[in-house]
A protein has these predicted regions:
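N-terminal leader/targeting helix
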Residues: 48-90
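An N-terminal amphipathic alpha-helical segment
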Residues: 73-139
Length: 180
């Protein structure tokens, strides 16, 4: 009996001179290992950021949520003009909005612990930072917002948990108080 083999399809892409020179420069400078890994990365970003829904240029969506590319300084200026005692509440509201977006767009229920790996991956893809679970702790490495109070509220609203900050500088560590 013959075993069914997975066929590999070869594809030829005709690039403009400028496009090819750009790709070659990425490879030459060590920013990309080769054309195949670059294309694979681009497709991964295309899928994970739902670029097929974008109305390029200038109107970007990820499911039901409109996405805007803003620099972190913009976010920091906004936060600096909001009283510190409101940061947890603002974070919580943002987390609740992110929860609705993930559920409606990705069919991921963020308040179920079995989905947290997928939730953390989504946050990482969108540039929020690197999120990890360690026992009853959530760790955020390289957060794009440097105010732990905002993250405390955000994660509480998103994940439906009660947290206590264990560090006030990045990497942030939050203990889950209602951990079961």
């Amino acid at each position: 009996m013959m075993e069914k083999r997975k066929t590999v399809k070869r594809t030829t892409i005709v690039l403009d001179k400028e496009e090819r020179e750009y790709i070659d420069s990425l490879i030459r400078e060590g920013k990309e290992p080769g054309i195949k890994p670059l294309i694979s990365k681009m497709l991964d970003v295309y899928r994970s950021m739902m670029i097929y829904d974008w109305r390029f240029p200038g109107e970007y969506y990820c499911g039901i949520s409109r996405i805007a590319f803003v620099n972190v300084e913009f976010i920091n200026i906004l936060l600096e003009n909001i009283p510190r005692e409101k940061w947890v509440e603002i974070g919580r509201k943002a987390g609740e909005a992110a929860k609705v977006s993930m559920e409606a767009s990705l069919n991921v229920e963020a308040d179920k612990r079995e989905n947290w790996d997928e939730v953390f991956k989504r946050l990482r893809v969108q540039g929020f930072g690197d999120f990890y679970m360690r026992d009853k702790y959530i760790i955020i490495k390289a957060p794009f917002i440097d105010k732990y109070e905002v993250w405390e509220g955000f994660l509480e609203g998103l994940l439906g948990v009660e947290l206590e900050a264990r560090s006030s500088t990045a990497p942030f560590v939050f203990e889950i108080l209602n951990f079961e």
